[in-house]
Amino acid sequence: MAGPIHEFAQLPRARHTGNSVWRARRAERPEGATPTVGLIYNPRSHRNKGQDLDSRICPDVIVAQPGHRDQLPEALARLAERGIDLLVINGGDGTVRDVLTCGDAIFGDDWPVLAVLPKGKTNALAVDLDGPAEWTLQAAVDAFEYGRRIKRSPMAITPLDQPEARVMGFILGAGAFTLGTKAGQSAHKLGAFNSLAVGVTTFWGILQALFGTRANPWRRGARMDIRLAPNGVALEHSGLGDPARRQLLLASTLERFPAGIRPFGTLRNGLKLAVMDQVSRMMTLAIPAVLFGRGPRNLRERGFHQLAATGFEIELDDQFILDGEAFPAGRYRVEPGPEIEFVAP
């Protein structure tokens, strides 16, 4: 379901809104009954190698294997009608984004418990949930009964001119982040995934920013107007470079990241932003230290902003990336979505 980077022409929407059927089916189940498990399996995910799921592996699990993103809303609606207690997502970050987006109209603010089997090229959510790379379906089902529960709220991103086109995901980036994602696709082709891909693209981006002029795409960034909720106050600018541009923006509700990076410093809970102005070459050299929490003091004066927010609106002149896929330039509202329980070992 998650493919090469491209802009959504249109988003698939569930024809069933609300979750009354799912709630009713779940309420009918006797106390102590075996949980009903649904599985979304994406054969296109990197580590699934294009193979269909062997149904003998999970005879007691309701399996949905949508061949295309457009089929996902109906697949989720059928699982909801069965009153599932646990929804297992077999795929990477892009598959998780698609499930959350397409399931928004079905489950609303009351989702079943989720589990993620990290099978994609990037699996940042699984890193945050401390999920083993080889986590199995049976292990996820066992964790529903005996494992830990971790609560996370995905970000909800809404185009201000298309409020019905809300999407949900965990990592949003713009400016140099967009270029870095494209470079990451090249790193994937070379066989670098997850933490290694993060290292490769970070190194390449620093080289570009270090030796390029402010006209270099890695240093130029994108025009961004960032307004913080609830009062619409503009995010401060250090005055370095063009005050209408930001070299990079990253927003997320995750708390732990691949390769141990800490882009938000000591901030952990809720929605967080890291925004970089067109910083000096000296500050560019310090970026690796900043990412690992050992950067210089006075980061804001040096053009690097780390903050928590209840939400924000952004207008930008270039596409942004949400969990590996590009969305068009425009004006958007970004805020925390529903709180969802995930199982972990």
Predicted regions and their residues:
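ATP/NTP phosphate-donor binding region
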Residues: 1-90, 94-106, 134-142
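ATP/nucleoside-binding phosphotransfer catalytic cores, i.e., glycine-rich phosphate-binding loops
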Residues: 2-28, 39, 235-243, 259-345
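Catalytic core of DAGKc-family lipid kinases
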Residues: 38-40, 46-49, 106-247
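Short helix/loop capping segments that flank catalytic or ligand/cofactor-binding pockets
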Residues: 48-49, 179-180, 258-260, 322-323
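Short aromatic-centered micro-motifs
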Residues: 63, 226-228, 320
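Short, well-ordered alpha-helical microsegments
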Residues: 72, 96-97, 257-259, 329
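Glycine-rich phosphate/pyrophosphate-binding beta-alpha loops
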Residues: 173, 177, 248-262, 326
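Histidine- and/or cysteine-centered catalytic micro-motif in compact active-site loops
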Residues: 229-231, 251-256, 276-280
